[in-house]
């Protein structure tokens, strides 16, 4: 009974926007030499990972490790995104707040990168993913990591790419802080 109650409480906490820490999926801490972000930033750039989707913590942790390994092979300093959203509706810490990402070259020093795990050229992310991203943005504003007057753009608005997928981009256009230009 106590275990069930603990699991329910944990689920409620995650549902309220707890960020799953990087240490749950990556044993390597972020290097103290990683460039810092000047916060609050005014720009949130949305991506999709074009990987397999994930629907539970175990699957998502595997995908996160694969993404980080791919980014490291491509000579990134670490995983490129600040946060990732799993198909399980959880918010996974990548670089986290205050660290400059490597997700949109001309905009890394002035933005937070949020990646939806999966490919959204072929369909819309599940509603729990969309809600998790909105929750993360609220947390970022509350923690003064993102300006209250922030803008949301898709990666394709910063360079020639299909990212974050046409279906996710069309959804972003409905969000109140979406802008046609960064």
UniProtKB/Swiss-Prot annotation:
Chief location of this protein? secreted
Q: Which UniProt keywords apply?
A: Disulfide bond, Glycoprotein, Hydrolase, Immunity, Innate immunity, Metal-binding, Secreted, Signal, Zinc
Which sites carry carbohydrate? 149
Instruction: List the cysteine pairs that form cystine.
Output: 54-60
> Which residues are noted in the entry as Zn(2+)-binding?
47, 155, 163
Kindly state which reaction or reactions the protein catalyses. Hydrolyzes the link between N-acetylmuramoyl residues and L-amino acid residues in certain cell-wall glycopeptides
- Residues forming coiled coils: none
EC numbers, comma separated: 3.5.1.28
Q: Where is this site: Important for catalytic activity?
A: 81
What GO terms in the biological process aspect are recorded for it? innate immune response; peptidoglycan catabolic process
Which cofactors does it use?
Zn(2+)
| N-acetylmuramoyl-L-alanine amidase domain sequence ranges | 40-165
- Entry GO terms, CC: extracellular region
Q: Which GO terms describe its molecular function?
A: N-acetylmuramoyl-L-alanine amidase activity; peptidoglycan binding; zinc ion binding
Q: Where is the signal peptide?
A: 1-17
What is the recorded function of this protein according to its Swiss-Prot or TrEMBL entry? Answer: N-acetylmuramyl-L-alanine amidase involved in innate immunity by degrading bacterial peptidoglycans (PGN). Probably plays a scavenger role by digesting biologically active PGN into biologically inactive fragments. Has no direct bacteriolytic activity.
Q: What family does this belong to?
A: Belongs to the N-acetylmuramoyl-L-alanine amidase 2 family.
What is the protein's name according to its record? Peptidoglycan-recognition protein SB2
Gene (UniProt): PGRP-SB2
